[in-house]
UniProtKB/Swiss-Prot annotation:
It comes from the Eukaryota. Belongs to the intron maturase 2 family. MatK subfamily. Signal peptide: none annotated. GO terms for cellular component: chloroplast. Coiled coil: none annotated. Pfam families: Intron_maturas2 (PF01348), MatK_N (PF01824). This is Maturase K.
Amino acid sequence: MEELQGYLEIDGFRQHHFLYPLLLQEYIYALAHDHGLNGSILSEHMENLSHDNKSSSLIVKRLITRMHQQNHFIISVNDSNQKGFVGHNKNFHSQKISEGFAVIVEIPFSLQLVSSLEEKEIAKFHNSRSIHSIFPFFEDKLSHLNHVSDILIPYPIHLEILVQTLRCWIQDAPSLHLLRFFLHEYWNSNSLITPKKSISFFSKENQRLFLFLYNSHVYECESVFIFLRKQSSHLRSTSFGSFLERTHFYGKIEHLVVVLGNDFPKTLWLFKDPFVHYVRYQGKSILASRGTQFLIKKWKYHLVNFWQCHFYLWSQPDRIHLNQLCNHSFYFLGYLSSVQLNSSVVRSQMLENAFRMDTAIKKFETIVPIIPLIGSLAKAKFCNGSGHPISKPFRTDLSDSEIINRFGRICKNLSHYHSGSSKKQSLYRIKFILRLSCARTLSRKHKSTVRAFLKRLGSELLEEFLTEEEQVLSLLFPRTPSHRPHRERIWYLDIICINDLANHE
């Protein structure tokens, strides 16, 4: 990163001008091949990407030589029906150009984020990227709030909106024209972006570029919260600043306050409530407030109008659900979360008079939703729709130990992700399904019965499904009648993406 930063300072690229000459540099394609910039700060799913064996220095040199030709892009456009300028299967060189372009547009924003973290003296921010770090924030804040809103971030209705979003940050016109050309080659210029089909297609073709565009789009949608935070006249905690850095995409837009202040001068009084908290993961976000239901409805009304009028985004009102925290459980990041009232009776006696007081304490609860999780296991062929374990087909050349290790790894990953559950009974049922499915798979392989196979295997199968959390809890907490191990919650700081089986959306 330091070498890259020095190169940009020497050639004047720090001012976001003339990014397109970087397409002629070999190290850009090396970064694209290795998913550079330290694993890409932007990406939430980059660990799942695979390397392409065709990315060699010889291919890159040939690609740069072709791009030096003045009529290369013109010929590619005129012959797009035969070659397919952007299609990965039809033109490998064009796919490499789009991947290199994705790295280039990330560079200024990555440097801006690193400098922002250095100014705030945030030495270690990787722990804050963990998904589990959101739930302690919920636990600390939501117990004092009244209402919660489930919000789905709207999708842009036209491709040009994505290009216009980057114009505020990148003044390099050729780079923006190249981005526009890539987008219109994927879809027709008159087509609309559909939430599922087009995004899944684009993410498979060039996931890095898609994530960059999507994050920049979401950041624009969330910019209203930065503005409203600055408009609040109440004191704010210092921890909120670091939380804002990892929630939003990159930094802050300096002129945003002036622009929005001129556009919405009469509605600022609606947002003076300091007890408003916002959390997002991917396209779903949670907005919680201590205000009245009237205030929350005003939030909904102005968010919808702000997105539609200022960013030309179509947001249906039913994409924002308003509920009271005491009567509603919201689904977020694979957990079913709610605020429960736990009543307790306190008896006190003063001289001859005795008093009894009933108190209710709000407590944040997180549980594992058993029905959606069983549906995910049924889709993965571990059980049927009713949760009955079945044998999973595996390759015949796999040994028994390899099959047991695979089942055990799946069970440990699920237990690791759902370690913050308040009630572990649902998780114990999932472990039972995976363990019995493993036994059925092995008994089917050996053409034996499950009972006979479990009797022969003994405790070896059980030890493979014993998670590290259970071993640690048995050492930290002694087994006493008052101790309830199924109520212990553990949040980890190494989880940067949602578990596939836990993602039911």
